Amino acid sequence: MAQINRKNTLRNLGVSEAMRRQVIQLDQVKSIDHGITVLIKYKINALLIVDSRGQSVGVVSKTDIMGAYYAGLPIESPLEHIMVTPPLFCYSGDSLEAALEQMRESGVYRLYVMDKGEGDIVGALAYPDIVGLLYQYCHQCEYSHLQGGTRSGQDDPVRRFTVREVMTASVKGIGLNETLNTVMETLSAYRFGAMLVTDAKGLPCGVISKTDLALSYRHGVDPEVEAGTVMSSPVSTCDVGLLLEEAIKKMTIADIHRLFVHKVNPDNIVGVLSLTDAARIRSGSCYACVSSRIKVNDHD
């Protein structure tokens, strides 16, 4: 990842500075089973699918795999049966602003990156990559909270983003005894990446992600089993008043994509903060760089 001079503005950043250079490609005739294995091995959320000539023809994400699980497709089915076409591209020389706008307009979470000269695929750009760049930008800044450049609390002259300002305020929980099919229906309906699982008292006791569902599919778990049998626990949470910079650090260290947000009591879940939420604010973690936010349309 590029070393960023703190004098730069986010508006001047390019796709090549944020993109991930490792692109995992699989032939369209490979099985869903094999695709899940590769996704888990490389800790990625999607695969670029190619034909026998090596040409990019589609994308298979964990959402597509969840759909196959729900539909009861044999796990030996080829990836071409569930891939989404066509894959969407941007160029390595494009501005990050333009790429983010393309992702927003297309309703996608990633773009594949092409070299404008040769036309080769040279990388992939997703929201976590953008957050990584923003986090690096903040960490190098003289105003960084984590660098100790300013004091916290009332003595801090810089107004900083908190989790409350960035999180998604609505949280849809599902009961411990609901089936995986119900979990998948809810994830699909609300376009969530994970579901909070609650016990008989309505208290959070676990999380089911699309990764958990993909593994259940691969292991032949009946989708009618109860959510509690495959959920992950404990629930990773943070306080609603936590600084955004601290929350991103927590997700980075734990290698997770979301934190459920509590207010005062960890059992009182009031929202969820994802890396996607953090990327969509188009700025760093405080108002010191608010003037350098990437411009978007007024309706965004």
Describe each model-derived feature in a short phrase.
Residues M1-D300:
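Tandem CBS (Cystathionine beta-synthase) repeat/Bateman regulatory domains
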